[in-house]
C-alpha cells in the first residue's frame, strides 16, 4: 500500500510555513509584516493600530509582540478571530457604517498611528474580475484609514499588480508624503501581490470624495483619436501602431474604389486609412475615370500603393480628384435667382408726416443731450482725479498756455461775466481737457461737494492702509516713516507777534469775505488752523494730549511776550535820542500801542537754558554727514556764518501743504541736499561702531555684576567679624591682627579650579564611551598618542624660541 503524500500547491509548505509553526504564528503572512517593519520601523512607536481583514490574526500577533505595552490594537474581519493577548477583535464588513461606529467605540477620541490591510477577495478563475475586486477593496480600506489616521500616520496595504495598480499609487501619493512599493522575501515569487507602505499622512481638512470612488479612480482614459491629416501631410512622422489590430478590424490592406474616392466628402480620411485606390474593369464609372486624360501613368502608379507616398504625391492625387470633379460637374451649387421683392410703402398724410418729423427731432435732441451730459460728467471725473493727484498745471508739456484761455480758472473776466454760481455748480472746468474722447459705458456724476469729499477721503484712506500694511511687514520702512514724521514740520519764519495793530485793522477793513471772493487759496482750504494734517490732528485729539496742548500754548505766549518787551524797550531808547518834534509824533503814534507788563523772566531764562543744555547733551552723531560737519566745526574749517549760509538753499522753504502723501514719500528719497563726507569721518564713525559692538553682552554684564555683589557681601561679612574680633578683650593685639589677616586672606583668596582627572584609555577603559568607573567630577580621556603629540609640541615650541 502506497504512502499518502500531502499536496503543496504553489509551494505553500515552504520554510516560512515551517517557521510560522515553530514560532507560534497563525499564518506565514506574519513574516511579511515582520520584514516590512524591519525595513521601515513603524510598529515600535505606534500606540494605536488598526488591522483590517485581520483573520486569522498573524499580523495581530506580530503587532502585539512588537508594540509598546499598553498599546491599543484592534482587528476586524468577516471571519471570526480567536482571542489574542492585548488585542480587540470583532466581526464586521469594513465597507459598512457599522464597522466605523464600532471602531469609534474602541478608539474613543484617539487616532490610529498605523492602519494595516492584508485582505483579498476570494480568487477564482476570472483573474481580471478578481484583480478589480481587490483594488476596490484596497480603496475602501484606504477610505477607512483616512478617517481614523492621525496626521503623519502610516498605512500598509497589499495590492495586486494589475491595470489599476498605477491608479491606486496616484491616489496614495495625493494623500501621503512618501509612498513606496516593496515585496518582502517571505512573499512567493509566483504571487502577484505587492505591498505599498504609505508614510506621512497629510490629514486634509476635507477629503475629496472622488479619491474614494472606484468609478472615478479606475476610469479608463480614452485614447486620442488618430490624426489622419498628419498621415497625409506629414507622412515622415507616421508612427506604427504597436498595440495590435483595431477593434473588429483584422485586415491591414484596405482598398477603395476610384469612384468612391472622387465623390467622397472627406478624401483625406480615405487617403490616411486606405492602402490602394483601384480601378476595377467591371465597374463602368471607374473605367471612365481611368480613360480620362488627367489620369496619367504617374497618378495610377501613386494610387497603387498609398502607404509609401510622400507629401508631394498626396497633393498630386488631390489635384487630380479636383480636376475630375470640375469636368464632371460634381459639387457645384445651383444658384437660384434672387427675386427682389418690392414693398410698397403707403403714402403718409400731412399730420402723420409732421408727427414723424417731430419724433425724429426729439430723438435727435435726446441723443445730443445725453452725449453732452456724458462728456460733462466724464470731464468732471477727470478734473477731480487731477485735483487729487496734484496735476492742476501740467508745466512739463505746455498745457498751462492752453489753460489760460477764456474758460480757465484764472480768467477773471469770464468768471465775472458768467457769475459765481457757474463756478459753484461746477460747470466751469478747472483746466481744459486734452482728450475729448469719452467712454460710452461709464457715466459717473459728482454733482455735490459731499461726493468729492467722500472720494478724497476714500483715496486718502486707501493710501494710509497701504502704508500701514507696508509698515507692518517691513521694519526698516516703519523706522524710516517714524523718523520722517519728526522732520515733516517746516519752518515758516520768525513770528514774534509785534505787527502793528493799525495794519491788522487796515487789513480787516479792506479784506473781503471768503464767500464774495473769486480767487481763493486751494492750499488753505485743505489745511487746519494749526497747520497739522488730518492724520496728525486725529492723533493729537486723544485725551492724553489735553494737558500738553495748554502747556505748549503757555510757552508760546511767554516767548511772544518776551520778544515784544525787548522790541518795545529798543523803540523807547531810540525815542529818547530824537528831537521834540519826533517825540510828539511818537507820542501820537504810541497812543494805540498796548503796553505789556514786564514779568520776571529770570526763571524762564533758566528753564530755557536748562532745556537747551539737555538738548545739546543728547545730540548723538550717527551719520557720516554729521561726523563730517562736527570735524569741520572742531577744526574751524567752517564757522557759524558758513553754516547759516549753507542753510539757505532750494530745500529750505519747501511747502508741503496740499501735496499728496504718495508724492512726498517719493520725493524724500531724491529731493534732498547731498552733503559731502570725508574719509576720516567714515573711519571715525566706523571705529565708534566697533567700540559699541565690542561691549560685552547683557548676560556677561549681569554675571559680572552678580560676582561683584557677592564679593562686596563677603567683604562686609569679613568686616563685621573683624569688628567683633577687635572689640573682644580675650585676645591680644597681635592675635587680633593675625586673626583679621587670616579672615581677609581667606575672603580674598580665589578657589583654584579643579583640574580634570586624567583617565588612560587602556585596559577596561579602552574604547569606553561612558564615564569610567570610580571617577567623579570632570575627567579627560588620554592615551599614548596624545602624550607623544604633547611632547612634540613642547619640543617644537622650544626649538622655535632658540
UniProtKB/Swiss-Prot annotation:
Reaction(s) catalysed (UniProt annotation): a ribonucleotide in rRNA + S-adenosyl-L-methionine = a 2'-O-methylribonucleotide in rRNA + S-adenosyl-L-homocysteine + H(+)
Catalytic EC class: transferase
Broad class of where this protein is predominantly found: nucleus
Keywords: Coiled coil, Methyltransferase, Nucleus, Phosphoprotein, Ribosome biogenesis, rRNA processing, S-adenosyl-L-methionine, Transferase
Annotated residues for binding of S-adenosyl-L-methionine: 57, 59, 77, 93, 118
Residues at the active site: 158
Residue numbers bearing the Phosphoserine modification: 362
Ranges annotated as biased composition (Acidic residues): 433-450, 487-504
NAD recorded as keyword: no
InterPro entries the UniProt entry points to: RNA_methyltr_RlmE, RNA_MeTrfase_FtsJ_dom, rRNA-MeTfrase_E, rRNA_MeTfrase_SPB1-like_C, rRNA_MeTfrase_Spb1_DUF3381, SAM-dependent_MTases_sf, SPB1-like
Subunit note: Component of the nucleolar and nucleoplasmic pre-60S ribosomal particle.
Family assignment from sequence similarity: Belongs to the class I-like SAM-binding methyltransferase superfamily. RNA methyltransferase RlmE family. SPB1 subfamily.
Protein name, entry field: AdoMet-dependent rRNA methyltransferase spb1
Organism annotation: Schizosaccharomyces pombe (strain 972 / ATCC 24843)
Source organism phylogeny: Eukaryota, Fungi, Dikarya, Ascomycota, Taphrinomycotina
Gene encoding the protein: spb1
